[in-house]
Amino acid sequence: MVKGFNVFIVLFIWRVLLGIGIGGDYPLTATIVSEYCSTANRGKLMAGVFAWQGFGNVLAPIVSIIVTACFMSKIDADVLYLDYVWRIIIGVGCIPGVATLYWRLTMADSVRFQNISANTRASSMESTRADEEKLLATETRNTNSISESNNEVAQSPLMESNRPGHTKTFSQHFSEWRHLKVLLGTSIAWFALDVAFYGINLNSAVVIDAIGFAGDLYQDKPSHFIIRNCVGNIIINILGSVPGYWITVFTIERLGRKTIQLMGFGVLAVLYVILGFAYNQILAKSTGAFIFLFSLAQLFQNFGPNVTTFVIPGEVFPTRFRSTAHGISAASGKLGAIVAQGGFLQLTNIGGHNAWIDHLLQVFALFMCIGFLATLWIPETKGKSLEEISEE
């Protein structure tokens, strides 16, 4: 028997590579848009770039429906044909990335970053000249003592790096509490959001199944069950996610980033408390009411912290640290996603099939409160230049 790779190992390897790419794209996108835009429309354009995720969230289940429909008769006869379906769907996801690769590779650094780099090089050259002059003066004064001169040469700053490394200057900057609390605020807020955001969105099929919208897996045809799940995702995204993104785009310059983030976390905490503690009662009375409240939560995720946790780290940090600090904030969010996925899978079925979903929603409410508190450490950036915000 010929043995091949375990499919989960292969997926894991490629997802790690995908994560490296996305891990670089998040801070790069936010930083470039932030540094290219004027103060008046910076937040709007940053939110607009991020809002295209909403269309991707709708397009993904549409592609899934189309591919499933193409294999419908074969899937219903043998579910192993789903192996073709999910591979094709993942392959289609490569197309947008490939389409934008050329422009991403040829995109120039912002003027702000180029100026910082030029100033750093000029400062380094001036430091070198000063060190050389100091060294020559030292040698002149100590011509009668070779050993003393050699000692001075060995200890001269010229022998060391003329410019502190990025890690050192980064550490020095964030060793001050007034700077560190901002980084902690953006990181903790993103972490708290993604626990709920990915806990729900990576498991939306579980939620759709729990409320009975997807039908019965054991009685319906497999293709019908999959398509109903996809339709459920489309409905939730169209009702909640997509409008939420674009409401933020058109209000972020008027309401402010911090205001939207605080409002979003606050409303989400209330909605998850309602959905969590009244879960069974709501479902018993009306599935439609649950879908409405669930979609409302999706709305305030995006007319709220899902957009602003991306925008704010692209504005609040100095140019020389902006992409690094944004990357740390985004990585904190993805750590929250890992916690959410692991916790959701482990806890969902405690006490029976989907029996613990109500308690998970209650846990998500707690994390929304944590995100709200972390946001208090973050300054408002509306109407301020990047230099004003970071005090450069």
Segments the model singles out, each with a brief description of its role:
Residues M1-E392:
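Transmembrane-helix signature of 12-pass secondary carriers
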